Amino acid sequence: MVRYTVDELFHLKPTESLPVQFDAEEFKAIIEKVKQIQALKEEEFNAHGGHFNRRRSSHHHHGRPKVKHTKPKVTTDSDGWSTFEAANKKVNEDEESENVSVAVVPETLKVKPNNKNISSSRPADNKDIIADKQTHSFNAFAALESDEEEET
């Protein structure tokens, strides 16, 4: 087959007659082969959803999921008053709470100090940590009685 340079291909025009050396059948066979290869590539591309083994991005989840809430039942009396009906779940929970007795066990709470925030070099003692406990209480009646005793 005769090979043409790029410049020669630009100068060729479809209205001109082809030179004697040009083999049109072989050229058409090459074009058909390229068309078949291109069709196979497009078919494979479309079979995979328009991408070649590309990971799907998680960017397509934009909003919150839609939660379907059921509308409460509204009953209207003969007087024209509208009231909401209570849900059945609340009734079931009340019945279960009556059947099950809850055992309350006193828990001992161990307080662990956070030594990295304490500026002292010695570790904190558990007795020092519980500072919220009131050491002595003020009794107003006892104070009044002591004042009266001092005056007499």
Curated annotation (Swiss-Prot):
Sorted UniProt keywords: Cytoplasm, Initiation factor, Phosphoprotein, Protein biosynthesis, Protein synthesis inhibitor, Translation regulation
Entry's Gene Ontology BP terms: filamentous growth; negative regulation of translation; positive regulation of cytoplasmic mRNA processing body assembly; positive regulation of translation
Region (Disordered): 46-133
Ranges of biased composition (kind: Basic and acidic residues): 124-133
One GO MF term: translation initiation factor activity
Comp. bias (Polar residues): 114-123
Listed Pfam families: CAF20 (PF17052)
InterPro entries in the cross-refs: Caf20 (IPR031456)
Basic residues bias: start-end ranges: 51-72
Entry GO terms, CC: cytoplasm
Subcellular location per the Swiss-Prot or TrEMBL entry: Cytoplasm
Domain of life: Eukaryota
Role description: Acts as an inhibitor of cap-dependent translation. Competes with eIF4G1 and EAP1 for binding to eIF4E and interferes with the formation of the eIF4F complex, inhibiting translation and stabilizing mRNA.
Family: Belongs to the CAF20 family.
Name this polypeptide is given: Cap-associated protein CAF20
Organism name: Vanderwaltozyma polyspora (strain ATCC 22028 / DSM 70294 / BCRC 21397 / CBS 2163 / NBRC 10782 / NRRL Y-8283 / UCD 57-17)
